[in-house]
Amino acid sequence: MTKEEFNVFCQSLPHTTHVVQWGGAGVWKIGGKVFAISGWAEEEPAFTFKTSDIAYEMLQEEPGLRPAPYLASRGMKWIQHYAKPGLSDAGLKLYLKESYRIVSLGLTKKKQSELGLNQD
């Protein structure tokens, strides 16, 4: 996945916003909370996303994936896709959607309601 494809996908998720911060990283948010980050790799795009505890344990040892620099060292369950083989584009999209879901569930009930999220 290219950085442009990553951005198009993240933008397609409801109510997302994009900012550039942390030394030029592209940061995607839902309700003001980060769910995905692009950048930080010179040779290839690097994509960072939040995971469940189980997914974190499974993914951290896979080739092309690692605990996300800065975030995982603080005890947060974030994975960075930084090299091939990593995840397929379809696999990365699934994890990005799951990151979006996890982060949206952490928003206040008021914010979720304002955004029309998690109303099931």
Predicted regions and their residues:
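Charge-dense, helix-prone N-terminal extensions
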Residues: 1-120
